[in-house]
Amino acid sequence: MRPLTWSTPKPLLPVAGRPMLAHVMDTLVDAGVDHVTLITGYLGDEIVSWVRKEYPGIRTDFAVQEKTDGLASAVLLAGEYTDDGPTMVVLGDTLFSADLSVLRGETRNMIVTSPVEDPSRFGVVLLEEGRVVRLIEKPSEPVSNLAIVGVYYFASGERLMEGCRTLVEKGQRTRGEFQLTDAMELMLRNGEPFGILDIDGWYDCGKPETLLETNRVLLDRNGPGETPELIRSRVIQPC
């Protein structure tokens, strides 16, 4: 995302007049989430300051990922703030439209998905008779068009941490990183049930050109703002 992120961390880049992270945080608040742990890296202090200022009523914890070695590794950093209750993982630059409150009380692990034209850019879900049977990170050959959008629900935070910890201890990397998709695949093989929540409202912010398109879509969706009324205005014609 250079040069946009030279001076601003990606989650704070503006989309439709607000930082990406604001859209994400609002969705979590609407779903009843009251405790958020943020994993930061580049320019992380700016994210910490912004969250504390904008969301003072939410319990927030922060951890720093010094080395960018994958999402599963980042999730492990939140382990000390996570109990055995339901836990969500949401990427800070993932914009989506979904009612996450439907996940309350869900006993399965749930993956939010959306159909895409180019699944090679994403982790994907393979279904058989409506059941999740395999999770594949950025497949080289098309096996499914159901992309993992970066929103996950886990019925047990403790079992999530166990899956990520096992992956890291085994040294199992994909494209040089510890992928959360691979950790979930290990959980699936160990009998953990997974379901999907399929949505259409997913907005890609991975590249500058898609960020511009997402900005346009969200502005169109929200409709035009009110036009201010000018009191006692005068128009001065050019000479």
Question: Predicted segment positions?
Answer:
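A secondary-structure boundary/capping signal
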Residues: L91-G92, I199
